C-alpha cells in the first residue's frame, strides 16, 4: 500500500498522483482515509498529457464503486479541473461511455444541493437535456430535471413533458456549468440548442449556485 499521508501526497508531482490514483486497490482497507479532494487539488490538468488526464478520470471511476467517495471532491476543485483541462483532454475522456457517465452523473447528482431554494420555490418546470455523441436514442445521452417546490429531481428516463429541451455537446456543458463558458455565446455559435420556453431557459442557470474555479 503506498503512503497516502497528506505529507506524502504533497510531495508528489501531478503525474505521480495520476499513477497513485490509477494503482490504488479498491479493496484496500486504508482507502476510506484518502482525501480525494486534496489529491485532485494538487493535480493541474494543464501539466498532464491527454492520456494522463484520461487515466486520472478512469482511476476515479474505478474507485467510485469502492470505499473512496469520489463525490467528496469539492465543487470548486471540480470546476478548476474542468477549467484547466484542454478541449482535447475533455473530448478524449468523454468518448469513453463509463467515464462520461461518471462525470455527467456526478453533475446531475449535485443539482439538488446547488439549487437556490429561495429562487426556485415558485418554479415548476421540467427540463430535458440531450448530450450529443452518446449511446442513447438517436445518439444522445439524456437526463431529465424536474424543478418543483424548491427541489430538483433527476431522472435518466423522460417521465414528463418538457418546458424546455436543451441539446449540446457534453464538453460545452461541462464548461457552462463550471462558469468556463457563456450560454449566449454557445447559443449564438450553434453549440447550444434550445426548444421550448426560451425566456425560462435564459434564466434557468440563475436557479443554481454554479461553482467557480
Annotate each predicted stretch with a short phrase:
Residues 1-213:
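Feature captures hydrophobic
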Amino acid at each position: 500500500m503506498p503512503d497516502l499521508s497528506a505529507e506524502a501526497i504533497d510531495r508528489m508531482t501531478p503525474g505521480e498522483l495520476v499513477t497513485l490514483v490509477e494503482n490504488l486497490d479498491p479493496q484496500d482497507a486504508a482507502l476510506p482515509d484518502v482525501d480525494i479532494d486534496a489529491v485532485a487539488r494538487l493535480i493541474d490538468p494543464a501539466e498532464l498529457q491527454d492520456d494522463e488526464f484520461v487515466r486520472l478520470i478512469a482511476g476515479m471511476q474505478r474507485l467510485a464503486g469502492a470505499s473512496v467517495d469520489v463525490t467528496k471532491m469539492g465543487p470548486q476543485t471540480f470546476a478548476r479541473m474542468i477549467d484547466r483541462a484542454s478541449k482535447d483532454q475533455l473530448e478524449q475522456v468523454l468518448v469513453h461511455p463509463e467515464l462520461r457517465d461518471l462525470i455527467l452523473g456526478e453533475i446531475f447528482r449535485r443539482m439538488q444541493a446547488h439549487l437556490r431554494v429561495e429562487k426556485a420555490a415558485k418554479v415548476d418546470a421540467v427540463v430535458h437535456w440531450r448530450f450529443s455523441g452518446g449511446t442513447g436514442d438517436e445518439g444522445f445521452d439524456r437526463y431529465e430535471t424536474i424543478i418543483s417546490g424548491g427541489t430538483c429531481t433527476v431522472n435518466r428516463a423522460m417521465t414528463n413533458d418538457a418546458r424546455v429541451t436543451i441539446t449540446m455537446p457534453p464538453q460545452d456543458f461541462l464548461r457552462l456549468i463550471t462558469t468556463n463558458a457563456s450560454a449566449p455565446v454557445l447559443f449564438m455559435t450553434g453549440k447550444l440548442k434550445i426548444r421550448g420556453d426560451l425566456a425560462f431557459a435564459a434564466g434557468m442557470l440563475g436557479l443554481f449556485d454554479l461553482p467557480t474555479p
